[in-house]
Amino acid sequence: MIARIWSGESPLWRLLLPLSWLYGLVSGAIRLSYKLGFKRAWRAPVPVVVVGNLTAGGNGKTPVVIWLVEKLQQRGVRVGVVSRGYGGKAAAYPLLLTPETTTAEAGDEPVLIYQRTGAPVAVAPERAAAVKAILAAHNVQIIITDDGLQHYRLARDIEIVVIDGVRRFGNGWWLPAGPMRERASRLKTVDAAIVNGGVARAGEIPMQLAPGLAVNLRTGARCDVAQLSNIVAMAGIGHPPRFFATLEACGAHPQKCVPLADHQTLSPADVQALVGEGQTLVMTEKDAVKCRAFAEDNWWFLPVDARLSGEQPDKLLEHITSLVR
């Protein structure tokens, strides 16, 4: 229903317009207060790059963060990552991730980024506190913040927006009548707009999510996902249909697709109930970090990597690297 409202297919969005105007006024006033100097943002002693969204819902932001961290690491840059840690609840903040940190403490995306990149990761509702924790513990040269485009309390040097190339901005309205956290005109002020799927427009960087081999959660064995049989697909991400479409494009045809809420807490019983005898469970890598501790033999995940096209990605990386002292 939310997807139909935000796309404009359902007329119910009109009933939510008063709340959207209120959201827009409040969010606009907050941004203006920082722009005019009524509120002061905290500036880190190292460059800060924000990777965020203009819309609610999954746009492919986390794969972009991983891509950016890995590319900078390849250039010899020491990178730290901060996040709000949505979906997790730590005993105390800021929380510096370790190999023992769980998704229940830090949230699924920070744990995934930590496991994939090996970069220092810290989470805190107040992102400046997370930055300070990383700087106190690690000699990093640059901070990447996973989400937080609208978190103006943290000053930033580079802003990158990730856009769903198929859904783009829906009906164009602020939350809750539409998907917008800020108006599309905000794109004029960011340093780069990366478009996940669909058709990129002039000045935007095209991106595709490239699937790899399916990985068994228990053994680490790898195989072409199309070789798996009797698949039940599970996706607890911002936009589950994208994952299901990826499986179909890979030649895997699930018998059942189970969309879950983004950041949904998963118990062993919850997941086991999805799979019948003789069936194979295939999930996203983000779900896998939550399920690995209680995984069964027939559970697999499909990793994806961000692939950015054209000359702009290299120019963006050069620009970011030039900020590092």
UniProtKB/Swiss-Prot annotation:
GO terms for cellular component: plasma membrane. GO terms for biological process: lipid A biosynthetic process; lipopolysaccharide core region biosynthetic process. This is Tetraacyldisaccharide 4'-kinase. The keyword Kinase applies. Pfam families: LpxK. GO terms for molecular function: ATP binding; tetraacyldisaccharide 4'-kinase activity. It catalyses: a lipid A disaccharide + ATP = a lipid IVA + ADP + H(+). Keywords: ATP-binding, Kinase, Lipid A biosynthesis, Lipid biosynthesis, Lipid metabolism, Nucleotide-binding, Transferase. The lineage of its organism: Bacteria, Pseudomonadati, Pseudomonadota, Gammaproteobacteria, Enterobacterales. Pathway: Glycolipid biosynthesis; lipid IV(A) biosynthesis; lipid IV(A) from (3R)-3-hydroxytetradecanoyl-[acyl-carrier-protein] and UDP-N-acetyl-alpha-D-glucosamine: step 6/6. Signal peptide: none annotated. It is an enzyme of class 2 (transferase). InterPro entries: LpxK, P-loop_NTPase. Its EC number is 2.7.1.130. Belongs to the LpxK family. ATP binds at T55, A56, G57, G58, N59, G60, K61, T62. Transfers the gamma-phosphate of ATP to the 4'-position of a tetraacyldisaccharide 1-phosphate intermediate (termed DS-1-P) to form tetraacyldisaccharide 1,4'-bis-phosphate (lipid IVA).
